[in-house]
């Protein structure tokens, strides 16, 4: 078995969609941990065992994803972990860019190529 490219922590507020997205990332060679219900739980898990990158979907409950990312940026232990926001649109995307300007923003279609820069060597 090929070693994983690295660990991704995926946050999506719809459990079945989170599983689908995680499956695609696993097929691309990533080890994936999911949180689909509780941003605070996600933040604590990320702080306890930091991944290479955090992926947050904005397609559902973008304010929850934005607040989780803000927590990660305001906590010393998680401040430097890259955050990738996926599928944001309109006002939700604008608010997120304003609150977390150093994050990467992409679409589901381009996520695998964006994640390549975080591959474990």
Language model regions located:
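Non-catalytic signal-transmission and effector/linker regions of two-component phosphorelay proteins
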Residues: 1-17, 104-121
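Conserved sequence signature across two-component system core domains
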Residues: 11-12, 35-36, 54
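Two-component/phosphorelay signaling modules centered on CheY-like receiver
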Residues: 15-34
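Acidic, metal-coordinating helix/loop segments flanking the phosphotransfer/catalytic sites
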Residues: 37-53
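His-Asp phosphorelay/catalytic-motif detector in bacterial-type signaling
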Residues: 50, 76-84
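Conserved phosphotransfer microenvironments
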Residues: 55-74
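Alpha4 helix (beta4-alpha4-beta5 surface) of REC/receiver domains from two-component response regulators
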Residues: 63-67, 85-113
């Amino acid at each position: 078995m090929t070693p994983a490219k690295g660990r991704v922590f995926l946050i999506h507020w719809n459990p079945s969609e989170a599983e689908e997205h995680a499956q695609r990332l696993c097929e691309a060679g990533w080890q994936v941990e999911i949180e689909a219900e509780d941003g605070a739980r996600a933040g604590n898990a990320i702080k306890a065992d930091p991944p290479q990158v955090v992926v947050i979907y904005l397609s559902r409950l973008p304010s929850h994803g934005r607040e989780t990312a803000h927590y990660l940026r305001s906590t010393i232990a998680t401040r430097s972990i890259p955050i990738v926001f996926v599928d944001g649109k309109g006002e939700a995307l604008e608010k997120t860019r304003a609150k977390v300007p150093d994050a990467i923003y992409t679409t589901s279609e381009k996520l695998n190529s964006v994640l390549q820069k975080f591959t474990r060597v």
